[in-house]
Amino acid sequence: MQWDTQVTLDGCEHLVTQAYCSALPVNYSLPLQLWERFARLILEAAYEATLAAAVLNASKSGNKSVYLTLLGGGAFCNDQVWILDAIRRATKLYAGFDLVVKIVSFDHSKPAIRKLCEEI
C-alpha cells in the first residue's frame, strides 16, 4: 500500500492511496486448469485486501471511491471469469461499507464487465 501519495500528472495536487497488486502468471508452464484454484486464491486475496484498504482510507479521508483494474488479465493469462468472480466476491464481502467501486478496463468496456458493474 502506498498511502497519501501524489498523482504524477501536471496540475494534479490531490493525493491518492494505491494498492500494488499482481496476479499469478499462469501462462508459462503446466496446463492452465492446473493453476486455476491457486490463481483464483491470489485474485481473491488481492481484491479483498484492496477493498479492506479502501474501507480504511474512506474512514480517514471520507473518500469512498475505489478503482479496480482487471489483475492478471493480460500477459499473465488469468481467465476473465476468475477475475470477475474475485471482484464479485470481494464487493459482496464489503457491501456494507458503501464503497463506490469502479472498474477500469483497457481500451473499451466488455459486456461481461458492464454486467458485473450492474451487479455490484
Language model region names:
Residues 1-66, 71-120:
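Macrodomain-like recognition of ADP-ribose-binding/processing modules
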